[in-house]
Every structure is written in C-alpha cells, then in structure tokens.
Amino acid sequence: MSSILIVGSYGSFTNELINKFYKENWRIYTLICNKKLIKPAHVFEQYVFKYDSDSVRTLINSSRPDVILFTGAYDSYYKWEDESAVEDSLNYVTGLSNLLMSAAMLGTRHFIYISSEKVFEDEYIIDIKEDLQTSPNSVKGMTISQGENLAMHFNQTTQMEVSVIRLAGMYGIPADRKACRDIYSGMCLKALVSGRLQVNAKKGLSALFVKDAVEGLYLLTKAPERKHVIYHISSLEEVTEDMVARLIQEKLSNQIDIVDQTVGLKSRLILSNSRFLEEFPLEIRNSYKDIIPQIIMYMNRHKNLFLHSDEKYQGKGLGHRVLRVLKKAFPFLESLVFFIPFFILNNQSVGNDYFGGINFYLLYVLLFAVIHGRQQAILASLLSVIGYCYRQLYSTSGFSLLIDINTYIWIAQIFVVGLTVGHLKDKFRDMEADKNEQIDFLSERLNDITVINSSNIKIKNYYAEKIISSTESIGRI
C-alpha cells in the first residue's frame, strides 16, 4: 500500500485530496498547524506542528511516506493579508525549506510542490507555457516563485524527485466566508454582501475546479515516472469578469448591479496544459457555468456563514451593533454609577466625628484602579476631582478654589495614587499573560512529544501486525 503525507490546512482542496487518495487505497498522513482542526475520517494519522518545527523530521521518519504533497500556494494557513504578508512569506519559505530538507535526508521518493498562476503577474496575450520566465510582482507571487526555485534546486542536487505543479486559478465551493479566496467565490461573496460587482471586460482568465485539479494530481502521483519537473494543470476555459458577473446576476435571487470598469488593453492569464495532457489522460469535467450556481445556492442556504451581522441582508445589524457598544461602554458606565454613592458618602462625612477622616474619593479611585487598571483609574480620578471641586464650592468661591495650593495637592495625590496602582495592575496582568503564554508553549511542546510517541507506537503495532500476518513470517511458520 502506497502512502502520502499531505501538508496543508483542511479545506475543499485538502479534503478532495484525502477522499481521492483514500478511494485509491492509499494510506494518508496529514500535517497541519492548527490544533482546532478535526481529523477527517479517512486520515490514518494526523500531525499538528509548525512546518519549520524540528518535529517534522521525526514525523517523516515515523510515517515514511512514499510521496509528500505540499499544498503551498493553496494552503489556507497562509492568509497573505497586507499586515501579515511579510511574516507569511518568511514562514512559507522556512517551512518549505524544512520540509524539503527533512524529506531529502530521510529518503522520500517524491515531493510535490503546489504552485499557482500567481507567479505570472504581467500581462500576456498568448497561453503561458512551463518554460516561460516567471514575473511575480506581489509578495505572495514572489514567495511562491521562490518556493518553485527552491523545489527545483532540491530536484537537481538530491536523489529525491521533486515536481512543481501550477494549478491555474483553482476554485471550489467554499465552506464559509474565510474560504472565499478564489476569483469565483470572491465575486459571489461581493454580490451577496454589497449587491454590486465591478468588472473589467478586457481581462481574460481561466479557473480550474478543485475536483479536476485533484484528478490531475492523482494521475501525476501514481505514474511510475514523470518526464518533466514543472507541469501546468488548467481548464483552458477562457472567460472574462463580465461573463462571470452576468451569470451571478442571473442566478442570485437579490438584485445585482454590474459596474463596467473596462480600461486598458485586452489581457489574458491562461496557463497552457499541453505538456500535462501529452503525458497524462486528464479530462476536465467541470465548467464554471455548472459550479457557480452551486456556489450561489450554498451561500444562499448558509448566509450566516458568509455574512457579518452588520452587513446587508442579515437583518439584525442594528441590535448587534448596539450590544457591542454597550459591552465596550460597560466599564465606563460602571465608574459613573459607582461614583454617585461615593459622592454622597463624601458629602455626608464632612464634619462627622467618625467618618470625617476618611477620603472616600481616594477609596473610589483605588477600587477601580485595582479592578480595571490604569484606564479606569484615570476616569475615576477625573470624576473625583469634579466631585471634590463641587463640594468645595459650597464654602468658597471658584476663584479662591483655583488659587488654593491645597486643591492642587489633593488633585496630585488622587492622580498619583490612581495611576500608580493602575499601572501596577496592568503590569501584573501582562506578567500573568506572559506566564500563561510560556506555560502554553511548554505544554504544546510536551503534547508534541506525546503525539509523536503515540504515533510511533501506532505505526509500530501496524507494521508488527503486518509482519506477523505475512505468509513468509516466522510467526505463521
């Protein structure tokens, strides 16, 4: 039985890979980074580590997969958002380097690196073939292209076979809003949220449905040999944004406005898959005309998974916004409410033989500084100063209050005590968070060791049973 290690977070792409290889009687291992993800039923063993972790070498040594497939350009673990693009790029390259190095050292037969059309970001008028020089401009494109170069370098310098597969605009039916990362589901989401689509009729594109992509990958993986290092898998079904927008407008129940923003010369981004089709018998079975209506139908049935509470068609936006504002304003309202009894107590204690020496405003400031920290201590101090000045105006004029040095001493005392205690509270809170973070890190390392150990035992038992059941084993003799 052949085995494969699929590296990448679970999603429509990874799930299709798992289902396909399971049907073909492969043993499936997965490597993910998110502990919250649930292991699919067909996965033999799941590992949860960072791709650049030292544990990667151990798990590859334990599982000994025939093939390692790195989902790379389509791994949903990498968000590629503006604020995190550089960090994602560093993690991507270091993770891929660790995977390639570990696989090569441990004798993995075949490593598959999944790339995409993002490595070509210039404008083209002809179909793009595998030998054309890449032209990335964005951080994501440059990172994926760098991953291709790294993979091809290992193919040339090690005994391990490495294949680079560019999947052209792969799309699927998204499970939720976060999964709307391809061109088609992204346009469907925009139409659902805003009821408006901006299109460029001169921009040609081609997208590949995830099931067709997985079928092509399986054909390449099971082949005894491959003639080339780089392959394109594409649908070659050329469409424009306005064609997709009109189909969405036709199928979506809500009114959709299409805004034509056609500018510039005609351009197209179509990857030629002639090299792949010459070597492997792939048949593209799914068209965007059939899949986009399915995407729209799924989104309409599960709007709660795709729309935020304050967005159009949700219906409960105002109530949720008010609730969020109230939650944020609660500590401030609490300070105002508690100020009233302290203000009354302070006024009643003036001239009292028993309570005259108690500074109720100082107690009030200390209470909120200890409970909430520096921010609420500042508000409590301001309210205390207002209450103090208001009480002093009973017996003196405003001008006399302004020039009285005792007023400023009292104000300084309140603020110094409040800010000091509030600062200590915030510092203790940060120290507690750092301590918990360190405990979580050490616990995670311990869990990693435990998982690897349990996995090794499971694999050992599997092979022991296989040896005993063999017709040539000593146990059967």
Question: What name fits each language-model region?
Answer:
Residues 3-24:
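N-terminal Rossmann NAD(P)H-binding glycine-rich loop of SDR-like oxidoreductase domains
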Residues 152-204:
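NAD(P)-dependent short-chain dehydrogenase/reductase
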Residues 334-351, 365-406:
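Hydrophobic transmembrane alpha-helices
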Residues 97-139, 382:
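Conserved Rossmann-fold NAD(P)-dependent oxidoreductase catalytic core, especially the SDR/UDP-sugar
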Residues 199-307:
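C-terminal substrate-binding subdomain of Rossmann-fold SDR/epimerase-dehydratase oxidoreductases
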